[in-house]
Amino acid sequence: MADPSFDIVSKVDEQEIDNAVNQTAKEIRTRFDFRDTGASATLSGESILLVANTDERVKAVLDVLQEKFVKRGISLKALSFDEPKPSGKEFRLSVTVQQGIADDKARAIAKKIRADGPKGVQAQIQGDQLRVTGKKRDDLQRVIQLLKAEDFEVPLQFVNYR
């Protein structure tokens, strides 16, 4: 019989992202404090574009977006954004949704498993995910608890537990 294993991934449901952006756009259209600010939120691929006529309004739109992400169960660790940039008469803020585990983060996770994990547990980097194998399921459970206690700045999900 094959050794027990599980995969560590960092994926965000695209439908939930779409729903959160649509809810944000709807709230922006109906809220009184966003009237006549030209505020909008649009999704295109892996990025979300937030637009408003002042720097503060763009940050307020970002707050609404983050609130909707939390309500839909999406980790804010999956979002990356910088400061709003002026563009003509409006300010734009691009928010990127990160999918998958970056190579440097994957190496840090594998190193943590080797250093602090139970003996006999191995982690292999497979593209944008990690496969963790071990002799006993109890060891794999300990690895999951170890990784949940750490902050790797990406949302981690544990799938394909066999």
UniProtKB/Swiss-Prot annotation:
- Which Pfam families does this one have? DUF520 (PF04461)
**Residue stretches in coiled coil:** none
What GO terms are given for molecular function? nucleotide binding
Alphabetical keyword list: Nucleotide-binding
Name the domain of life this protein comes from.
Bacteria
What cellular-component terms does GO give this entry? cytosol
Function text: Nucleotide-binding protein.
The record's family statement is:
Belongs to the YajQ family.
Descriptive protein name: Nucleotide-binding protein FRAAL1054
Could you tell me which species this protein originates from? Frankia alni (strain DSM 45986 / CECT 9034 / ACN14a)
Lineage of the species this protein comes from: Bacteria, Bacillati, Actinomycetota, Actinomycetes, Frankiales
